[in-house]
């Protein structure tokens, strides 16, 4: 512990303590702490966990969320010089890896956790005068350290795991001890296998479960879970429910074709089991609270206390979403916009794909009678922006040729579409007193657990079978398709039946395709699309799912005489590999750090 305050990782983390710990590594007023007695100062030790939590992104408008979608067939950057756009079309340079921040941040977070766990310094530190409360806090912080380390390794593995240039399926370097700069040999930094990295994540989850509170909710009749230390006081922190969510996410990734060459179905079963645990808690425990969870009730992205949430980031009041996603005519910049392919992925209101004649889809009126989730996620020509409080019309999207929001103008979408999901409809740049809203990232939420369960459970039982897990895969998808939108608009299939879901549930192949499309539309702009396309790819040399032509639409005509819709090509993705590259400089520094296949020149 002598050199604990000098710790940093060679993996892109030089200066960690100088920059990262300055917020909490402060002496008392008389300056009386040093390297030997720093554990006497609980704010320092607790600060390791506080800092590890604070490193998580707190806005969807980053490279990892909406930006990541722009690397797929869901969205595109308006700015052609954006590093993520250049990366996806094959014109990037080795110095412009847009995902390096994930690598750096994750290893910073891991190192803070390792510092807390080293020699049990964190759990042996006294934080509070009241003994009972102090012991509860010690346990929760110990659980936080383990699960945050698991979380950051999951993030690293999802981003950088893959087949290396040596032909092996690799994970990331696994470090479970604080690293001292003067003793760290760059040659010792090696990637664990993919399986070994998963096993480390699951071990940390098992360790965390011993210490974490059951649920970050207030239980008035339970003394332990109603202390000021647990319950809602820990909102935004992990509990055993979100821990099981992390397990479900990890097992689903591990079970997927890209990472499961032997086709081990027990991984799918574990993913389904943990997702079902989370779902059952929502359905049978949180549903009993006042204002608790109800799967038949929608939610708002601006309601950061809504029971949809399982694990959430820190929150902040900002206008980033609005100024980045609206067109310039309404105070925005159209930084990232939806594609025609994503628009086409939303079914008709009766649940059928628009490619199915039974959908009633009319290509001359492409936005009519669509699944209401489409209108809640995407602005199209003719969409109205209405104030959330009184339904006042504030703006109308005019993206037909000649309109104020048409492609080719400053600050307008090249595809003719704009992202509606996440924007606050109480914001108007022309108000005398502009109102903003709180925003956060919903890292885990109810709908995501439904998707994990539907996908995983359908691999080990039939879509209609609810006997194995207490819920059927079909029911999990029905929860999504029957639910009112985030704007409160009712589901057509909830009121009139969902024959297409019934049809798909009778065919494993159709059900699998439906699950994949529900992943796409339910979590659009949340950063999952690239990872989903990759994990579903059994042959790593098959790039057809990611190297696609990105389309928009050119709209001519007017409302009176009718519109004509002509597909346009915006760009073509040109990835050399389904794997993302490790940061170039770190591969150069560490001679035994194997680069991912397809990025041989980045070493």
Predicted segments with their positions:
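Membrane-proximal, proline-rich intrinsically disordered regions
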Residues: 21-72, 291-297, 347-368, 378, ...
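C-terminal substrate/ligand-recognition segments
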Residues: 372-482
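Conserved, well-structured interaction surfaces
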Residues: 54, 82-162, 184-217, 363, ...
